[in-house]
């Protein structure tokens, strides 16, 4: 049984409220869960301490038992200092694409050609 620490959605239409729960990975998003370990209210201000409420002891015990947090919950745990989120590094993402490299090369050739003509 693979355990996940994840969000379950509650609240009304257009007014989301999430519970942070420990659940079997195969269970539906809003279905059966094992333990409630916190809450997240995205409608509150970002600096409001009640926006994210975590039960630190329960979370640490479930992490020790092997529960895996989802990406969003891992962000919350990292901000609270309960878990470390690995830094993502993708150096290729910053590189320009092939077509833009070709365009830049053509521009450089065109700029170099008039300079050579003026020098000659």
From Swiss-Prot:
Biased composition annotated in UniProt, kind: Low complexity: 111-120
Family: Belongs to the bacterial ribosomal protein bS16 family.
Stored Pfam families: Ribosomal_S16
Domain of life of the native organism: Bacteria
Transmembrane annotation, as ranges: none
Identification of the protein by name: Small ribosomal subunit protein bS16
Any Gene Ontology biological process: translation
Entries under PANTHER family matching the protein: 30S RIBOSOMAL PROTEIN S16, SMALL RIBOSOMAL SUBUNIT PROTEIN BS16M
Designated gene of the protein: rpsP
Ribosomal protein recorded as keyword: yes
Residues covered by region (Disordered): 81-120
Gene3D superfamilies: 3.30.1320.10
Compositional bias segments (type: Basic and acidic residues): 95-110
Entry keyword set: Ribonucleoprotein, Ribosomal protein
One cellular-component annotation, GO: cytoplasm
Organism for this UniProt entry: Methylorubrum populi (strain ATCC BAA-705 / NCIMB 13946 / BJ001) (Methylobacterium populi)
